[in-house]
A protein has these predicted regions:
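A short helix-to-beta-strand connector/capping loop
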Residues: 58-62, 100, 131-133
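Glycine-rich phosphate-binding loops of nucleotide-dependent enzymes
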Residues: 104
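Conserved P-loop
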Residues: 2, 6-95
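Generic detector of well-ordered alpha-helical packing
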Residues: 41, 107-108
């Protein structure tokens, strides 16, 4: 029996490109005239291409960031990070009710791995997503429960990733 909820896509793994994969699908949806909502957990930097893009196409593209300014690692997580992740999840619940074609929950897997969110609450929310809405979950170290729940799961690995080559504006961010 097919569930009456949106389709869940999960991108995880230690390789780069999980957010980039999600953004590619977002671009595809936008090209067809559909609405896209991106909620970024643990991210705050506004100098990324995906964040700047909202100025170009404001009517069908929404992006929200819920990260502590200056945050750069998992070693110094605080209650503020937990609070911001809760706000991000609440925003996702609100936006899902608007039935966008695509809802991207960027880095939610990492937020779950860091225990900033409750896995049961996230899965309960995903069960309520309207069937018209496709959801993409990104981030390293996706919990096994989420992997089992998702409809499609992709693991991203780096075959080759030279550290001496710097990141490039417009490519990696």
């Amino acid at each position: 029996m097919v569930e009456e909820r949106g389709t869940i896509y999960l991108y995880t793994g230690e390789g780069g490109g999980k957010t980039t994969n999600a953004l590619g699908l977002a671009l595809r949806c936008l090209g067809h005239g559909y609405k896209v909502v991106i909620i970024q957990f643990l991210k705050w930097w506004k100098n990324t291409g995906e964040y700047k893009f909202k100025k170009i196409l404001p009517e069908n593209y929404e992006i929200y960031q819920f990260g502590r300014k200056g945050w750069k690692g998992l070693k110094n997580l605080t209650d503020k990070d937990r609070e911001l992740c809760r706000k991000a999840l609440n925003m996702a619940k609100k936006k899902a009710k608007e039935r966008p074609k695509l809802l991207v929950l960027d880095e939610i897997n990492l937020a779950l791995d860091c225990k900033l969110l409750d896995i049961g609450e996230v899965i309960d929310f995903l069960k309520t997503v309207p069937k018209e809405t496709n959801v993409i979950l990104t981030g390293r170290r996706a919990p096994q429960e989420l992997i089992q729940f998702a409809d499609f799961v992709n693991e991203v690995i780096d075959i080759k990733h030279p550290d001496e080559i710097p990141t490039v504006e417009g490519i990696q961010y």
